[in-house]
């Protein structure tokens, strides 16, 4: 039976735990560490997992160790547990869920030959609709990578990418939920400005975006084709799209994505 260690029981760590348990994994095979005893107790009561405060204890004989801590702590935690990982009877796989920390930096902080996987998650994994990308280190074999993908698939979709694409991936999936939250927020405000109650405007906007996303995913059609299907000649939608285009919406997304990728690259240098 696979044993999982989750170092850090924050939002991302809890989302992973929730997904694994929903996929019928035995909670007694999931160890979660927290600096806060209160938080650890909360997760134990909610999910029935094993709550620990010692990272090395959690990593002991774990098959997969997920590092769900802030980027600045990744190397520190890896250095802390590397001795335990060396002594495990079977080779453990370490999975970093933090932005900005390269595979090379992690491999240098651990003993030679440690399998390391770098993941770029996003927050919709909190509701089982995440988009996680995986990049394998040089010591990860096909079976180990497949195991990590299977575990991550419990909280959404998974895609393998090259590490050289991570900055672009950060702009496209890691940060993009925030773009959509902002667009939704703006549309809700527009609805209120038109005289709708805020609750009504929110319901209309959120349900419409959810439906549109489902159409793009399930029909396989290009977004431009789906947009054309809503845009009758000289109609209301065409009038709205014209305003958005004249306001420079495409350029705004180009610049936002570039700024995000640039910042991701900058963080990766430190």
Curated annotation (Swiss-Prot):
The keyword Ubl conjugation does not apply. Belongs to the pyrroline-5-carboxylate reductase family. This is Pyrroline-5-carboxylate reductase. GO terms for cellular component: cytoplasm. Its EC number is 1.5.1.2. Its main location: cytoplasm. InterPro entries: 6-PGluconate_DH-like_C_sf, NAD(P)-bd_dom_sf, P5C_Rdtase_cat_N, P5CR-like_CS, P5CR_dimer, Pyrroline-COOH_reductase. Disulfide bonds: none annotated. It holds the Pfam family P5CR_dimer. It is found in: Cytoplasm. One of its GO terms (molecular function) is pyrroline-5-carboxylate reductase activity. Gene3D superfamilies: NAD(P)-binding Rossmann-like Domain, ProC C-terminal domain-like. It comes from Corynebacterium melassecola. Catalyzes the reduction of 1-pyrroline-5-carboxylate (PCA) to L-proline. Pathway: Amino-acid biosynthesis; L-proline biosynthesis; L-proline from L-glutamate 5-semialdehyde: step 1/1. It catalyses: L-proline + NADP(+) = (S)-1-pyrroline-5-carboxylate + NADPH + 2 H(+); L-proline + NAD(+) = (S)-1-pyrroline-5-carboxylate + NADH + 2 H(+). GO terms for biological process: L-proline biosynthetic process. It is an enzyme of class 1 (oxidoreductase). Keywords: Amino-acid biosynthesis, Cytoplasm, NADP, Oxidoreductase, Proline biosynthesis.
